[in-house]
């Protein structure tokens, strides 16, 4: 259970970094299969779920034991989803990977990842400063 806003921001950063890392792997997998006959691209869905949690929507939960209770309202339960892109293809082989789109997504994801890492580093530096009471 998250107890304060600082824990919430760390958890959001962690979940966002997990999703952007997964998206990077998925995009790389799509690019690697650009010439595979019949291959359908995959997408990582995360931002919509994050926005829903921030608006107070409940998450569908997975439990390992039916006796475990959880209301699904916290960011602790948030994770990304993998979705197969079943859109049609202009190619004759049925592959729907657009290399230009994938490269643009890869660049945008790298920028987002770097921004999240910078934010996390700033939070850690601030905590380190507070712990040392401002002394160097």
Per-segment meaning from a language model:
Residues 1-136:
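Amphipathic alpha-helical polymerization modules
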């Amino acid at each position: 259970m998250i107890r304060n806003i600082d824990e919430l921001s760390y958890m959001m950063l962690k979940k966002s970094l997990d999703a952007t890392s997964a998206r990077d792997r998925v995009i790389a997998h799509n690019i690697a299969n650009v010439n595979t006959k019949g291959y359908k691209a995959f997408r990582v869905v995360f931002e919509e779920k994050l926005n829903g949690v921030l608006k107070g929507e409940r998450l569908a939960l997975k439990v390992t034991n039916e006796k475990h209770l959880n209301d699904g309202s916290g960011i602790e339960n948030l994770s990304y989803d993998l979705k197969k892109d079943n859109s049609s293809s202009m190619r004759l082989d049925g592959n729907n990977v657009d290399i230009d789109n994938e490269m643009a997504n890869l660049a945008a994801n790298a920028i987002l990842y770097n921004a999240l890492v910078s934010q996390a580093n700033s939070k850690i530096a601030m905590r380190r400063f507070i712990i040392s009471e401002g002394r160097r």
